[in-house]
């Protein structure tokens, strides 16, 4: 089992020492959140809070995903950075291909390209992208980014994007794993066609259902190769629980040590955060 450390919506000056501490403690990865901006008004509900409340996001600092990952990659040597998750269809795919390809080449292929659609129509409006057909749009984005990060000439002609024969360098020396976030059936099918899935949390029974559905969809898609399953689960906090997750096919456990979905700023000191991640490494990672 591999373990990824998750921290978000905290003092952005903490990220560098936290990444260094996580690497030293034996974590395999660290998750990198994504948010462009906070809309003053929205009719949408936040998908990962019980009541759909989104106000806790107001004023929370999010360093741009590629900028943060490059900074953390420069001060680590082994830690992998998994986007959790990048709002892909609001961005131009050719530019994202250049960003993620350059990043992976620069930091030694230590990038997990976690992507999803945004639940906020305001994100699309802000960046001048239609909210409609976002599922089809993200599929085209993924195909384009995969093609442009090979280092070979690639062209694409789709419903939303038209890419003439083009080569981008530098390219990573390994394919960048494409990990899909989301619990909807369309997201699960998209994950089944790609390299892995990123779980957004929830009760254990729901996780079992989602994993079973992923297995079914992979069979339908004829996919038999390696597949990453990244989950948030209470089972991830004990040695016995980790074994149960392994038996279900989970490859990566995402662990954090506070609930970020609360109003106000995070006041936990950096020293406390580091001690928490170190204690988990001593009590769980070292014993599995």
Where in this protein do the model-derived segments appear?
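Active-site-adjacent structural elements that line small-molecule/cofactor binding pockets in enzymes
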Residues: 1-288
């Amino acid at each position: 089992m591999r373990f990824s450390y998750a921290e978000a919506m905290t003092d952005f000056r903490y990220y560098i020492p936290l990444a260094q501490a996580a690497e030293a403690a034996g974590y395999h990865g660290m998750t990198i959140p994504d948010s462009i901006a906070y809309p003053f008004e929205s009719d949408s509900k936040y998908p990962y809070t019980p009541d759909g409340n989104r106000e806790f996001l107001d004023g929370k600092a999010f360093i741009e995903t590629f900028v943060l990952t490059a900074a953390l990659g420069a001060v680590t040597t082994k830690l992998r950075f998994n986007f959790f998750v990048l709002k892909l269809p609001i961005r131009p795919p050719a530019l994202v291909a250049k960003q993620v390809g350059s990043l992976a080449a620069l930091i030694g292929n230590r990038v997990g390209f976690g992507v999803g659609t945004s639940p906020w129509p305001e994100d699309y409006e802000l960046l001048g992208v239609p909210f409609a057909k976002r599922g089809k749009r993200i599929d085209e984005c993924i195909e384009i980014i995969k093609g442009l990060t090979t280092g070979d000439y690639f062209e694409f002609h789709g419903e939303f994007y038209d890419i003439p024969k083009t080569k981008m360098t530098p390219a990573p020396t390994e394919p960048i794993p494409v990990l899909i976030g989301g619990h909807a059936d369309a997201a699960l099918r998209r994950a089944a066609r790609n390299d892995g899935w990123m779980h957004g949390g929830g009760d254990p029974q729901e996780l079992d259902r989602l994993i079973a559905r992923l297995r079914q969809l992979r069979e339908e898609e004829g996919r038999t190769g390696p597949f990453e399953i990244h989950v948030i689960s209470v089972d991830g906090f004990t040695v016995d629980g980790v074994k149960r997750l392994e038996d279900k096919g989970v490859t990566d456990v995402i662990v954090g040590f506070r609930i970020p979905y609360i109003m106000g700023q995070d006041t936990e000191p950096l020293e406390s955060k580091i001690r928490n991640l170190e204690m988990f490494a001593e009590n769980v990672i070292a014993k599995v």
